[in-house]
């Protein structure tokens, strides 16, 4: 028996690429611009995809488009499918010389990152490094969703799908405007921290919980320099790696205070999915990380 299938009813790879772009960009116009398609084509393909799956994938509103519950479920599969397609290409096209795009995420305060990136670029100039900043929890999620090839995060972590590589360990310092600091000040002075998902914030909150202290106020930021400059102006106090505040401390604009050893250090690890295809560019990147980790240990 021969089944006649209409060509326009078959889900194509480009439909998944369009769907992913609209989901990421939040609008048809932005997705069309990113993919270099006309808007009407993007709209038609999304509508066709919804008809084929017999479910709405997006909510339409004046500000753009957001995923429905079914759309969010669809996005997980689309990320995986497109990642598998990329890996399929890599298996056959990957040459001995590292090349292509390497999408790397990182928390803001990896002191060894510039050295690692510089060394890697000098050794492998044919690799296009794409760097994305974020918080530990969101970077883990993006690695798991195949949106990033790997990421530098605050660790260590335990996850069955993730493997990790040691990068560095740093001291955490409490940073204040005043030279003297008493632990009771946590109840009278605002805490300046990154959003939830930051490793330093987790350490600070654990310390305060163990001490039975309730901070007066928590003010959230997403830029390190804004936090440090706000501390220098007397807005509040924060906890960050020593290397991140060295320049302001040396200039006398802020003062650093050691905290109990139990909470006083943070490790940076590089993570990737265990089941991701190991390209030559990633293998070389891990080798560069390992070399600099050994240098730091000497």
UniProtKB/Swiss-Prot annotation:
Does the UniProt entry include the keyword Nucleotidyltransferase?
A: no
Q: Which CDD domains match?
A: PBP2_YofA_SoxR_like (cd08442)
Question: What SUPFAM superfamilies does the annotation carry?
Answer: Periplasmic binding protein-like II (SSF53850), Winged helix' DNA-binding domain (SSF46785)
**Which residues, as ranges, make up the DNA-binding region of this protein?**
28-47
Where in this chain does the record put each HTH lysR-type domain?
11-68
Q: Which is an annotated GO molecular function term of this record?
A: DNA-binding transcription factor activity
Highest taxon above the source species: Bacteria
Q: Note whether Heme occurs among the keywords.
A: no
Q: Which UniProt keywords apply?
A: DNA-binding, Transcription, Transcription regulation
Which Pfam families does this UniProt record tie to the protein? HTH_1 (PF00126), LysR_substrate (PF03466)
PROSITE patterns reported for this sequence: HTH_LYSR
InterPro entries according to UniProt: LysR_subst-bd, Tscrpt_reg_HTH_LysR, WH-like_DNA-bd_sf, WH_DNA-bd_sf
Q: Which family does it belong to?
A: Belongs to the LysR transcriptional regulatory family.
Q: What is this protein called?
A: HTH-type transcriptional regulator CzcR
Q: What's the source species for this entry? A: Bacillus thuringiensis (strain Al Hakam)
């Amino acid at each position: 028996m021969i089944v006649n299938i209409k060509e326009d009813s078959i889900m194509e790879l480009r439909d998944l690429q369009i769907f992913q772009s609209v989901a990421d960009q939040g609008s048809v116009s932005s997705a069309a611009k990113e993919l270099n398609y006309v808007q009407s084509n993007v709209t038609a393909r999304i509508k066709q995809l919804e008809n084929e799956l017999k479910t709405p994938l997006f909510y339409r509103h004046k500000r753009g488009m957001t995923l429905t519950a079914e759309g969010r479920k669809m996005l997980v599969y689309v990320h995986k499918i497109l990642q598998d397609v990329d890996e399929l290409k890599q298996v056959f096209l990957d040459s001995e010389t590292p090349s292509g795009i390497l999408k790397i995420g990182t928390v803001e305060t990896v002191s060894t990152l510039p050295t690692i990136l510089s060394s890697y670029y000098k050794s492998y100039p044919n690799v296009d490094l794409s760097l994305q900043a974020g918080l530990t929890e969101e970077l883990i999620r993006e690695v798991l969703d195949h949106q990033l090839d790997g990421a530098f995060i605050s660790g260590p972590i335990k996850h069955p799908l993730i493997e990790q590589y040691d990068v560095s360990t740093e001291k955490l310092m409490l940073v204040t405007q005043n030279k003297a600091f008493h632990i009771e000040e946590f109840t009278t002075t605002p805490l300046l921290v990154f959003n939830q998902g930051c490793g330093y914030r987790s350490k600070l909150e654990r310390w305060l919980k163990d001490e039975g202290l309730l901070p007066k106020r928590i003010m959230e930021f997403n830029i390190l320099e804004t936090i440090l400059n706000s501390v220098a102006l007397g807005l509040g106090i924060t906890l960050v790696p020593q290397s991140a505040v060295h320049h302001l401390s040396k200039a006398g604009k802020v003062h650093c205070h050691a905290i109990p050893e139990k909470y006083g250090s943070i490790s940076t690890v590089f993570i990737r999915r265990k089941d991701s295809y190991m390209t030559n560019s990633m293998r070389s990147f891990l080798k560069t990380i390992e070399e600099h980790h050994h240098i730091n240990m000497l």
